[in-house]
Amino acid sequence: MSRQPDLFRDGLAGGWKVLGAELGPVPEQLRCDVVIVGSGAGGGISAELLARAGFDVIVLEDGPLKTSRDFHQRESEAYPTLYQEATARKTTDKGIGILQGRCV
């Protein structure tokens, strides 16, 4: 069985700077060209394209940084970490569940 690539582990090994939480304190001041709030589908690709174009990009995310070795194919472990309110977030009338991510 082939091993899945771990883009985050490779990025960290290649010099990505990750700050906050268990990785250490965030400095009081940071300088960059662009700040992306949220690493979802739009935020992640925007950050990549801007970085490739030469911009200094910071991505702010609510939850933790997860790599492929953090996943064990168990929903009961994944949902509380990966989604806001452990997938319990719903519309006001509780008619629709909202799966809103909270990690990189």
Indicate residue ranges for each PLM-predicted region.
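N-terminal glycine-rich phosphate/pyrophosphate-binding loop and immediately adjacent elements
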Residues: 3-104
